[in-house]
Amino acid sequence: MITLRNISFSYNGTKENNLCDISLHIPKGQCVLLCGASGCGKTTLTRLINGLIPHFFEGEFSGEAIINGMNSEEADIAQLSDSVGTVFQNPRTQFFNTDTDSEIVFGLENRGLPPEQLLSRLEKVTEDLQIQNLRERSIFELSGGEKQKIAFASVYAAAPDIFVLDEPSSNMDYHSIKELSELIKKIKLQGKTIIIAEHRIWYLMDIADRVIFMENGKIAHDMDIKTFVDLPEAQIKSMKLRCRNLADVKAETVNVSPDVSVSFGGHTFAVKDITVKLGHTSVLQDISFSTTGGEIIAITGENGAGKTTLARTLCGLTQEAAGSISFDGNPLSRKMRRERSYMVMQDVGHQLFTDSVYAECRLGIKDLPDPAIDEVLTELSLNRLKERHPLSLSGGQKQRLAVAVSVLCGKDILIFDEPTSGLDLKSMQEAGRIIKRLADDKKTVIVITHDIEFIKTICSRVLILSGGKIVKELCGEKKNELEMQLETF
C-alpha cells in the first residue's frame, strides 16, 4: 500500500534534512501511529505520503515513494488525492467554503457527482459521524473542535483508501476524542490504511497496530503496539512522549481556601454574572468566578460550550450583554481589559506578524533587553530558531512562540486558549513551567484547555463549562475525577 525507499527531504531555505534516509512499508489495512517530539518530522512524513511533497512543498528530495501503486513524483496530485485523504493539523487551512454542508461534499462536487448523489452522501456522512448538529452552519462560527470534525467529514465523504490524520485530537474535547477513536475503529474495520501523527496518544492504544517513533527526521523505533504498550514508563518519558493512559496521570495537590486571596496573596480578578449573546441567543449565561494572582485556573468543557467566547470576553475582544469584570474591586471596561490583558489564541497563526521569531518577541514591546528575550526563548527551546520565519515553524513551535510573547509583554491578565495544542511532553512541561512562573509573579492566569494531562499536573483549579454555564468546579485531588465528571455532561 505504502512503500518508502531511502527518502530524504529538506525544505527550501533550511540547512538540515527534515527527513533523513526513511525506508518503511505500510501494508493495506494497517493503523500506524507516528509519534515523537515537535519538529521531529512527523508532519513532513505525512506530506510525503499524501503527495504534497514533492508536488506542493518545494525542497531537496531523494528516494522513492510508492503510494497505492503510484510513484509520488510521477503521479498527478489529483490521482494521489483520490487515494489519500488528509486531515491537517490546522483544519482551517483546508476549508474552501463558508458553510459546513458545502465543505463536506466539496471534494465530491469537484469529481462531478450530481446534486442528488451529493445530498445522499451528505446525509450518510453526517449520520455516520453523528454530526447532524453541524449541518447548515457557518464555518466561521464553529469552535476549533467542530472545525476538526468537519475536516474529517469532508475526507470521510470522499472514501479514500488511505487516511492521513495530523494531530486530529488537538482541538477536540474529551467526548469528541472518544468519538474520534470509535470512528477510527470504524474505518479500520472497512479495511482502510490509517496513518496518525499524534502527541496525545492515550486514545489510540487499543486502535493502532504499529508505532513509529521519529527523532531528528529519522525513524528511531518501529514496533508493534504490544511492544510499545509494554515499554516501561521511564522509557516513555525519556522518549518525551505523553501518557498512554490518562488514569496514570495524578493531579498536583494545590490547596485553595474559600478566600483565594488568602491562599495566594495576589490581585483578585472577579467575573460576576457575565452573559454574552450572539444575536438573540445567549452563548454564555450568568458566568461568575474569581481568581487571584498565583492561581492557575483551567476552563474546560465540550466543543462549542462557549470557552473561547469567554476568553475573548475576559480580555475585552467580545462585548458582554450583562455582568461585570473587576480587578482588585475596580471595574474593568472592555478598553481597560484590552490594555491590561494578553491572549494566546487557539489558532496562533492569527497573531504572528513579523519575519523572524526574534522580531515577534519585540513587536509592540518597548525597551526590551536582548537577554530577557534569550532567556525566555531558551526556556521554551526556541533559541536556535530565533532567525526563522514564524510561519515556517511547526504547530507546536508556533504555540511556544506565542507563549514566549505572552511572558515578555508584561501584562497583568494572561489568557491562554489551548496553549498545549500540538505540543509533545517536553514542550507541554516547558509551557507549564512558564505559566507557573507567571502565576508565581502574581499574574492572573486563565487557561482554556481540553488537555486533561495539563490540567491535572499544572492547574490549581478547573471550571467545567457546559451549555454556556459553569456546571462544576474541581481543585486539588478532586481533579483526578475530571474524566468521570466530563462523562456526565
UniProtKB/Swiss-Prot annotation:
<dbReference type="Pfam" id="PF00005">
    <property type="entry name" value="ABC_tran"/>
</dbReference>
<dbReference type="InterPro" id="IPR015856">
    <property type="entry name" value="ABC_transpr_CbiO/EcfA_su"/>
</dbReference>
<dbReference type="GO" id="GO:0016887">
    <property type="term" value="F:ATP hydrolysis activity"/>
</dbReference>
<keyword id="KW-0547">Nucleotide-binding</keyword>
<keyword id="KW-0677">Repeat</keyword>
<keyword id="KW-0997">Cell inner membrane</keyword>
<keyword id="KW-0813">Transport</keyword>
<feature type="binding site">
    <location>
        <begin position="36"/>
        <end position="43"/>
    </location>
    <ligand>
        <name>ATP 1</name>
    </ligand>
</feature>
<keyword id="KW-1003">Cell membrane</keyword>
<protein>
    <recommendedName>
        <fullName>Putative ABC transporter ATP-binding protein TDE_0282</fullName>
        <ecNumber>7.-.-.-</ecNumber>
    </recommendedName>
</protein>
<comment type="similarity">
    <text>Belongs to the ABC transporter superfamily.</text>
</comment>
<dbReference type="InterPro" id="IPR050095">
    <property type="entry name" value="ECF_ABC_transporter_ATP-bd"/>
</dbReference>
<keyword id="KW-0067">ATP-binding</keyword>
<dbReference type="InterPro" id="IPR017871">
    <property type="entry name" value="ABC_transporter-like_CS"/>
</dbReference>
<feature type="domain" description="ABC transporter 1">
    <location>
        <begin position="2"/>
        <end position="241"/>
    </location>
</feature>
<feature type="domain" description="ABC transporter 2">
    <location>
        <begin position="269"/>
        <end position="487"/>
    </location>
</feature>
<comment type="function">
    <text>Probably part of an ABC transporter complex. Responsible for energy coupling to the transport system.</text>
</comment>
<keyword id="KW-0472">Membrane</keyword>
<keyword id="KW-1278">Translocase</keyword>
<dbReference type="InterPro" id="IPR027417">
    <property type="entry name" value="P-loop_NTPase"/>
</dbReference>
<dbReference type="InterPro" id="IPR003593">
    <property type="entry name" value="AAA+_ATPase"/>
</dbReference>
<dbReference type="InterPro" id="IPR003439">
    <property type="entry name" value="ABC_transporter-like_ATP-bd"/>
</dbReference>
<dbReference type="GO" id="GO:0005524">
    <property type="term" value="F:ATP binding"/>
</dbReference>
<dbReference type="GO" id="GO:0042626">
    <property type="term" value="F:ATPase-coupled transmembrane transporter activity"/>
</dbReference>
<dbReference type="GO" id="GO:0043190">
    <property type="term" value="C:ATP-binding cassette (ABC) transporter complex"/>
</dbReference>
<feature type="binding site">
    <location>
        <begin position="301"/>
        <end position="308"/>
    </location>
    <ligand>
        <name>ATP 2</name>
    </ligand>
</feature>
